[in-house]
Amino acid sequence: RALAPRPAVAVRCQEGQLAVTVRRDLFGTGRPVRAAELSLGTASCPPLSPNSAQAFVTFVAALHECGSTLQVTPDSLIYRTTLFYKPTPSGNPLIVRATPAEVLIECHYPRKSNVSSGAVHPTWAPFRSTVAAQERLRFSLRLMDDDWSRERLSNSFQLGDSLRFQADVTSEGHVPLRLFVDQCVATVSPDRSSSPRYAFIDLGGCLVDGRADDTGSAFVSPRPRPESLRFLVDAFKFAGDAGNLLYISCHLRVTPVAQAPNPWNKACSFSKASGLWAPLEGTAAICSCCDTGSCPSPG
């Protein structure tokens, strides 16, 4: 018989204290939160000596500690406190990749026995992403399922998810073509020049979002074919924006397959392992301008 997975937050109400166990993969996205981003109560009590290698973080506190409150009812004593998740700000102040969360915790102590609060499964509200591509020839830009086998049926995502984009061009009747993405911009309105705006691909093919410490955004290697290009972008939203809709517009271009990639036509991802920009095809030199920001404008 398969064991049920442990809940994201579990509470044990003991005789004079409570113990809270928090799964580091708090939201079930596969991206663990940092122990330092978690605290208990209004007094911001830290967890017990956290170990980054462990899958769980534990808090232990006396019932009256960490700013807890007590309610006395005819049948019970009810101690209340709150688990806070306050994500570390992104390196880019324009965007956020995680939103704060609060989990209310209660311990009920009846006259003859005690009970623990039920398991809590916090979630983020999803936001929707609407994709539009500038069309030249017959271009398309699609959100794909996790295995890239078909177009994703839903445009709803949660922070912590990865967005899988596939760009294509239909090249019948043309010389063999290679597709590139010059720029992709996210906005909160259909106007790609509106503000706020965030260019996560820029400089003629640099996936600049992958440069941030908290992302795994990158072009996918190898291509399925020269006229297709896949890339991953970690889900995000604009800081301070109460809406749940993003518009993504990308500028696509093609070159003949016979033409080698160059600083004008490139697909460059930042490698966290090497600390360097790496091209999907071509020599490393074509990506050097991604660091300097002096890439030549595509023709």
Regions found by a protein language model. Give the residues of each.
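Long, disordered, Ser/Thr/Pro-rich
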Residues: 1-299
